[in-house]
Amino acid sequence: IINLIGYIDNNTFKNFTIEKMHQSLKINSILPWIIIRMSMQHMRNKKWGKIINTSSIGVDYGGGINSFNYSISKYVNEFIPIEIKKHFKFNIFYNVLKIGITETKIHNKIYNKSLKKRIKLVPMKKIAKPIDIANYIDFLISDLNKFINGQIIKISGGE
């Protein structure tokens, strides 16, 4: 299971509503957790499973001005419940990728001036390509990964 959902509603702390926050939580966090929960018994029976959930590097910095609901929903994904950890002994892997600024439709909508300013904050001074994230996911779900489990892993150019 790979959760790469990234719904953002451009709400600030000043203007968020319960309904909008619930929408972000439902899409980015609750629905993926339901899928994970529904899959656990099958993975346990097979004695194998790989789960990758995602968060955002913005969580470490209080999120962006227009991403209050998004940031909270991604922060929720960093929680690794004890119920998941109990399944590790059945060869089930669960990791969270905390992804930095990446060349996606969301970031391509940011004006060039704002995007350049944001990239300057990244120690590597560049934006990740989708293939950078895909390669890391490929490793984590491959047979090469035999011991990285229960981790929050940053893919953020040094942030």
Feature names for model-found ranges:
Residues 41, 82-87, 146:
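Alpha-helical segment proximal to the catalytic Tyr-Lys
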Residues 4-10, 158:
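Conserved NAD(P)H cofactor-binding loop of Rossmann-fold oxidoreductase domains
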Residues 138, 149-159:
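Short C-terminal tail/terminal secondary-structure segment
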Residues 91-93, 148-150:
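Short, small/polar-rich loop/turn modules that mediate ligand/substrate recognition or access, typified
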Residues 50-76, 81-82, 86, 101:
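Catalytic loop of short-chain dehydrogenase/reductase
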Residues 122-133:
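A conserved structural motif in NAD(P)-dependent oxidoreductases
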Residues 12-13, 20-22, 107, 118:
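Substrate-binding pocket helix/loop in short-chain dehydrogenase/reductase
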Residues 7, 14-34, 48, 52, ...:
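Catalytic Tyr-X3-Lys loop
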